[in-house]
Amino acid sequence: MRFVTVLFLTTALVAFPAVKATVHTECFNYFMKKDGCVWSAADDRTRCNATNGKPPFQGVERFQHHNQKTLQRRYTSEDTNTSFAMRDGPGICGNYSTNQPGACLWVGSEQVYGNDTATAGWLNGAKTSNCGKQLYVQRKGRPDKPFYVPVLDGCSFYSKNVTVGCTQIALSNKTFYDLEPTAQELKQGYLGDLIWDFNNEAGTKGQNAPV
């Protein structure tokens, strides 16, 4: 009987291997710490509420005060000069053409492709989990005209600061022009009023959830 019990436990361990915890990026951890939730996260317990912008309910034994003014609903490029058009590349996520829809997100504090998952902004060379995930990008005040594009690469945005880097986005030439830049924006080389996020706000498209 003892032999049978040991055999059963061994078989069970093989059949049900240990589940590894998700290693999150610098940006995911930054927003989780700042807001108590992350927009479009896969887990209902950590995803910001798409209806009212509040962190998920934590239970009566864990009261937390959250200032709604600091809770960023989606990410905006307003008052930055970083929503520029990308060039062709091989990149972190592979080869791509700037003539296809797509976007580039912050590589993190290492400022290079990187070989350390702990320093990935939204992605880097060692942490590619967010590659290919679909974002939506729209002009401020134009919720009727979103564009859905994949993450194609990582960009430094010349910043090592999570408070700056995590909200930045660069665009393929195709998406840049799809967003109808003004004459001034074409002259300056960047768009100044974008709103974007991973396309899983309601939790129904988990394949696009950021990590």
Task: Please report, for each region that a protein language model flagged, where it lies by residue.
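Secreted/periplasmic proteins
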Residues: 2-7, 12-170, 174, 178-211
